[in-house]
Curated annotation (Swiss-Prot):
A Pfam family of this chain: Ribosomal_L3
GO BP term, pick one: translation
Source superkingdom: Bacteria
Keywords tagged on the record: Methylation, Ribonucleoprotein, Ribosomal protein, RNA-binding, rRNA-binding
Residues found modified as N5-methylglutamine: 151
Protein encoded by which gene: rplC
Family: Belongs to the universal ribosomal protein uL3 family.
SUPFAM superfamilies named among the record's database cross-references: Translation proteins (SSF50447)
UniProt keyword DNA-binding present: no
PTM info: Methylated by PrmB.
Subunit structure: Part of the 50S ribosomal subunit. Forms a cluster with proteins L14 and L19.
Name by which UniProt lists this protein: Large ribosomal subunit protein uL3
Organism: Bartonella tribocorum (strain CIP 105476 / IBS 506)
Amino acid sequence: MRSGVIAQKLGMTRIYNDAGEHVPVTVLRLENCQVVAQRTVEKNGYTAVQLGVGFAKVKNTSQALRGHFAKASVEPKAKIAEFRVSPDNLLDIGTEITVEHFVPGQRVDVTGTSIGKGFAGVMKRHNFGGHRASHGNSITHRAHGSTGQCQDPGKVFKGKKMAGHMGQVRVTTQNIEVVSTDIERGLILVRGAVSGSKGSWILVRDAVKKPLPDNAPKPAGIRRLVKEKTEMVAPVTETSEVEGA
């Protein structure tokens, strides 16, 4: 089981496939996603990695989080989240995950917080059909109607579909297809809509109901830092001896 990533939702657009058909996609940006902490069986009883993403001002970061990020030798992050991983996919602190973590055609599970709609009636919240528009009906056109039985059981059962607060809940959409990735700009394009407003943080992880592609990188798609080692060689100058003065 690999780690997931934290991405930021930029919005929706559409792209065209090889057949000339347009595909609606949601654009997710992966920026500065690093491992800031580890969870091990010996110390915590389970195996996981804590990721941080984005940039946060030091003055807006609490003293506790400043010490947490300083211990990991990373910059303050705007968002942190934890992902369970298998022991063989545990990542070192400071490792940066890129969009190469996912491959086109892969299925992922996406988690976000839906847009809040406020107090909504049953026709909007639960897709009720409503009552008659006329023929004796008065002021109950959009009402929910009866909510229970009679003296027995003498109550309204829990979970009854009624008017109330709608939206602003954690929603996970499973088996979304990764259409493509943009390595240079750090973008992940997934098919269809994703819960959440523009600019919100989205959790993207491998689908639990679909197999992982064989070409998916393990333990993760990390940024390779190539350090060029140059040997400093002192210049050699040839000196000619002048005979005679």
